């Protein structure tokens, strides 16, 4: 990240910082500096409060300038499908290209969001690990409730497979086979599969939009 002093970006409405990532002063300094450089960071399990913060940040950056790229950095083991789909839909909704960068781990919903970045602008650091599998969830209640939940799980599974096939260029039959169990990829394997477009080792290999003037 550039050492040039970046202005503090106003944070609208509720606190957009991810919980549990240091005290308020640390969060203010780091996350506002990242936002000023059009960087959004997903560094935890995907759940509702995290998704709300990331969606708000994407909308904020789109409103500020709909022509400049947004960079979503991902180090996540996955999480809630509904929370992840809120982020996914917002990525597609904003006018900006959303570039994605994986570091550490992009598993499950983290993998899904990684491959959903703008075509040609999906990156992985060399030692990141990517894992794809089918969505899972508990089923309980009456027989009728179980039938409804099972139907919804099948719908979610098919929908996500179709989206992954779209973003990777893989046949959906291949996605069905490969996501039936946990499948792990190195960064280079993820590139070959179509999850990412580039494996990079240095920050200068990821184009930067720079701070807001």
From Swiss-Prot:
Compartments reported by the entry: Cytoplasm
Major location category of this protein: cytoplasm
GO CC terms of this entry: cytoplasm; endopeptidase Clp complex
Enzymatic class: hydrolase
Highest taxon above the source species: Bacteria
Gene Ontology MF annotations: ATP-dependent peptidase activity; ATPase binding; serine-type endopeptidase activity
UniProt KW keywords: Cytoplasm, Hydrolase, Protease, Serine protease
Pfam families for the chain: CLP_protease
InterPro entries reported in the protein's UniProt record: ClpP, ClpP/crotonase-like_dom_sf, ClpP/TepA, ClpP_His_AS
GO biological process: protein quality control for misfolded or incompletely synthesized proteins
Catalytic activity: Hydrolysis of proteins to small peptides in the presence of ATP and magnesium. alpha-casein is the usual test substrate. In the absence of ATP, only oligopeptides shorter than five residues are hydrolyzed (such as succinyl-Leu-Tyr-|-NHMec, and Leu-Tyr-Leu-|-Tyr-Trp, in which cleavage of the -Tyr-|-Leu- and -Tyr-|-Trp bonds also occurs)
EC number: 3.4.21.92
Residues annotated as catalytic: 108, 133
Known function: Cleaves peptides in various proteins in a process that requires ATP hydrolysis. Has a chymotrypsin-like activity. Plays a major role in the degradation of misfolded proteins.
Family (UniProt): Belongs to the peptidase S14 family.
Self-association state and partner proteins as the record states: Fourteen ClpP subunits assemble into 2 heptameric rings which stack back to back to give a disk-like structure with a central cavity, resembling the structure of eukaryotic proteasomes.
NCBIfam families from the UniProt entry: PRK00277.1, PRK12553.1
Record's protein name: ATP-dependent Clp protease proteolytic subunit 1
Native source species: Frankia casuarinae (strain DSM 45818 / CECT 9043 / HFP020203 / CcI3)
């Amino acid at each position: 990240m550039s050492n040039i002093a970046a202005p503090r970006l106003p944070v609208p409405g509720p606190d957009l910082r991810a919980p549990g990532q240091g005290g308020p002063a640390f969060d203010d300094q780091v996350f506002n500096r990242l936002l000023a450089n059009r960087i959004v960071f997903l560094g935890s399990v995907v759940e509702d409060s995290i998704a709300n913060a990331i969606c708000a940040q994407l909308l904020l950056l789109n409103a500020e300038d709909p022509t400049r790229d947004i960079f979503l950095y991902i180090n996540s083991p996955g999480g809630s499908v509904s929370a992840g789909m809120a982020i996914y839909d917002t990525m597609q909704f904003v006018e900006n290209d959303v570039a994605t960068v994986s570091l550490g781990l992009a598993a499950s919903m983290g993998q899904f969001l990684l491959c959903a970045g703008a075509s040609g602008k999906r990156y992985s650091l060399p030692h990141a690990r990517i894992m794809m599998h089918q969505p899972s969830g508990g089923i309980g209640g009456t027989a009728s409730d179980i039938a409804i939940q099972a139907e919804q799980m099948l719908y979610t599974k098919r929908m996500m497979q179709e989206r992954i096939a779209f973003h990777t260029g893989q046949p959906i039959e291949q996605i069905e086979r490969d996501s039936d169990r946990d499948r792990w990829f190195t960064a280079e394997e993820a590139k070959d599969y179509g999850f990412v477009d580039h494996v990079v080792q240095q920050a200068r290999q990821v184009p930067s939009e720079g701070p807001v003037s």
